[in-house]
Amino acid sequence: MDDLMTNIEHYHVSLTTGFLPPSAPLTHLPQKYYEPWETLASSLPTRIRDGSLRHQASLIPLLETDFLVTDAEWQRAYVVLGFLSNAFIFCQYPPSERLPLSLAEPMMNVSCYLGLPCVPTYSGQTLWNHCYISEIQLPVLEQVNTLVSFTGSREESAFFGISVAIEKCGSPLIRTLLHAMAAAEAGNEKELTACLSKAMITIDSITSILPQLYGRCSPSFFYNTLRPFLEGTQDLKSAGLPNGVFFETKNGGSYQKFRGPSNAQSSLFCFIDIALGIEHNDNSFLTEMRQYMPGPHRDFLARVEAIDSVRHFISANPDASQLQEAYEGCVLALARFRQIHIRLVARYIVIPSNGTKTADQSSMGNGLSSEPVSIAGAQGTGGTKPVEFLKVIRNDVLESLQAS
């Protein structure tokens, strides 16, 4: 445990910022060589609106990734290429079956370096794609801005910013829950109780952030305007692309099929579950989502999994009433978060899906198509039925109390 705490930065995790980078993400790649990427990314909302994106993307030269040096540069490249790629594919209906060489080749190379699939993920749209408008230590939603955007809208910034604010607010849980696991390992009941009580307060603070999205990002904007750009390449059969999207490469190319970005790709909540010993009865989707987390984060979670969760110690000490109460409070706080998240998803996905607008009514891409705006219907962008999935996750959280 001491070794893990000492070398935590090796896993691109910070005791201060959690899974967010310790320094602000790059707003621009420093090498002029990559200016074609940056120029198109900066004009992305305009190019999508006027219908010129695919033409402009076809003019970009094939750029090698050899000149990317720092982790921040690789992350910035992944953000830019991820947005450009999904914008190219989904800016019009039907989606493009092919991603041109100038985007596909570097996207595959950058993704491979970062240990990610060649598709936009939670990390690329949230962890590495934000800046703080002001220097207040704990950002609220108004203080988070998106660096690369499909629409250029404050509503889009609010949608992605809510996850940034949650990650920042939840960052103290890294230290708190690692200390809790160390206390359990050492049999220190008093310290473990204190850590769990502290964790409960932090989780409740996270939960209080979720409703801030209401009024800042409308369900109509999210579902009809933003969400089409958050699709993956896996569930496109209904759009006539059963094989996914063909990524052109210098060696020919191949079809790629990956899920879209999902909050299930957040390493923070996976870490919380591991530390508290919350087991999921059907974890196949959550296990798959690990592959959509940055490689170092996956390695960190694997290290934490190798340590006994606090639940083992708590189960072995049923008469420690204060400890049991602290654990119960922590788990119930997490269940409250899951419940509020269910309500949010119902408002932003399920309800709009019952009255889906067509693209000419909702400004998907250039607004010329009459095809349904959402390929996935009431599915989440990760390919699940979101409310059903989240209810199972919430119930798994509550079941951990019965088994403790």
Swiss-Prot record:
Gene3D superfamilies: 1.20.58.480
Organism superkingdom: Eukaryota
Pathway the protein acts in: Secondary metabolite biosynthesis
Pfam family, one: IDO
The EC number(s) this enzyme carries: 1.13.-.-
Any one annotated GO CC term: cytoplasm
Free-text comment on the cofactor: Binds 1 heme group per subunit.
GO MF annotation list: heme binding; indoleamine 2,3-dioxygenase activity; metal ion binding
Family as reported in the entry's similarity comment: Belongs to the indoleamine 2,3-dioxygenase family.
Protein name: 6-hydroxytryptophan 2,3-dioxygenase fscD
Species of origin: Fusarium equiseti
Gene: fscD
